[in-house]
């Protein structure tokens, strides 16, 4: 679960995620998500509730490539609607820069696991 913090706008994201948890979990199940994790500014002091997007790392259950494309964009649309803000949805394995991948791996927080 995403940790709660009281300082800065990060608590806004935690609150929005918590308030929409049931709907987000339903969307994850519908789109065959294996894991959904939060990373980036939503977990740092530089998050601003007015401008920052929410960075999410997603791993889908095994499926055919075309089905994965549909699942990805379907989930992305639902998350943007549910969170009422921009969402950067990054698939596990898509980050090729080892420094960025290591930073995401080090800081990510689990939100959903099937």
Labelled PLM ranges:
Residues 55-58:
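Short, aliphatic-rich beta-strand segments
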Residues 1-37, 43-50, 61-114:
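Catalytic core of pol beta-like nucleotidyltransferases
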């Amino acid at each position: 679960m995403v940790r709660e913090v009281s300082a800065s706008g990060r608590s806004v994201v935690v609150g929005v995620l918590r308030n929409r948890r049931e709907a987000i979990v339903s969307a994850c199940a519908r789109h065959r998500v294996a894991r959904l994790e939060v990373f980036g500014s939503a977990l740092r002091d530089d998050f601003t509730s007015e401008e920052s997007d929410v960075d999410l790392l997603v791993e889908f259950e095994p499926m055919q490539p075309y089905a994965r494309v549909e699942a990805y964009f379907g989930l992305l649309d639902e998350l943007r609607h549910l969170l009422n803000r921009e969402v950067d949805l990054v698939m596990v394995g898509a980050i090729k820069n080892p420094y960025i991948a290591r930073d995401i791996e080090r800081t990510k927080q689990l939100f959903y696991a099937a």
